[in-house]
């Protein structure tokens, strides 16, 4: 039986689903706009420059640190042969890679063997960090995704 209470419930369900959908569209676009600004990234390879190794001495005087370069993308830190005598650390800008990524701030990818990783970040000199971790700015999307999925399921099952 169709009642006014059901109509209000359906209306709220649709409104919540629409707001959730708009949130998923709007948030990535605002994040992508921030990536167009220039940032500074360290540019070095520990194979040829010991200053590039971990742990990185970010408290050293600028002249004692690896060179900085202006970057119109994201900073990258790549590690090969992690935690071994052959460990190699490379810090650079994504403009030097043949890669097209969106919203990669504080994202790390592990090598399949587990002996290396590659991390991306979007703040000045952020590739000096020994460990880049997710900063939690995108974690609020998980409950929204669950709620929107549940609401869409409820809406489609009626």
UniProtKB/Swiss-Prot annotation:
GO terms for biological process: negative regulation of membrane potential; positive regulation of circadian sleep/wake cycle, sleep; regulation of circadian sleep/wake cycle, sleep; regulation of synaptic transmission, cholinergic; rhythmic process; sleep. N-glycosylated probably on Asn-57. Residues 128-158 form a propeptide. The chain crosses the membrane at residues 136-156. Keywords: Biological rhythms, Cell membrane, Disulfide bond, Glycoprotein, GPI-anchor, Lipoprotein, Membrane, Signal, Transmembrane, Transmembrane helix. Glycans are attached at residue 57. It comes from the Eukaryota. One of its GO terms (molecular function) is acetylcholine receptor inhibitor activity. The keyword Lipoprotein applies. Residues 1-32 form the signal peptide. Residues 54-67 are annotated as: Loop 1. It is a lipid-anchor; GPI-anchor. It is found in: Cell membrane; Membrane raft. Disulfide bonds join 41-75, 44-52, 71-93, 108-119, 121-126. InterPro entries: QVR-like (IPR031424), Sleep_regulator (IPR050975). Consists of a single Ly-6 domain, adopting a three finger fold stabilized by 5 disulfide bonds. The first loop contains a region essential for protein folding or that is required for localization to the cell surface. The second loop mediates protein-protein interactions. Interacts (via loop 2 of the three-fingered Ly-6 domain) with Sh/shaker; this interaction may stabilize both components of the complex and may be required for targeting or retention of Sh/shaker to neural cell projections. Interacts (via loop 2 of the three-fingered Ly-6 domain) with nAChRalpha3 and potentially other nicotinic acetylcholine receptors; this interaction is required for antagonism of nicotinic acetylcholine receptors. This is UPAR/Ly6 domain-containing protein qvr. It comes from Drosophila sechellia. The lineage of its organism: Eukaryota, Metazoa, Ecdysozoa, Arthropoda, Hexapoda. The gene is qvr.
């Amino acid at each position: 039986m169709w009642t006014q209470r059901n109509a209000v419930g359906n209306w709220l369900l649709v409104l919540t689903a629409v707001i959730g959908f708009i949130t998923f569209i709007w948030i990535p676009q605002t994040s992508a706009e921030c990536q167009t600004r220039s940032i500074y990234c360290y540019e070095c390879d520990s194979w040829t420059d010991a200053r590039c190794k971990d742990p990185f001495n970010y408290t050293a005087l600028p002249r004692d640190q690896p060179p900085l370069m202006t970057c119109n993308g994201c900073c990258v830190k790549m590690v090969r042969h992690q935690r071994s005598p052959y460990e190699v650390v490379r810090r650079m800008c994504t403009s030097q890679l043949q890669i097209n990524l969106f919203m990669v701030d504080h994202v790390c990818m592990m090598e399949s063997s587990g002996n290396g990783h590659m991390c991306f970040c979007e703040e000045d000199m952020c590739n000096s960090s020994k460990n880049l971790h997710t900063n939690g700015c995108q974690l609020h999307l998980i409950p929204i995704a669950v709620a929107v999925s549940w609401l869409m399921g409820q809406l489609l099952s009626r």
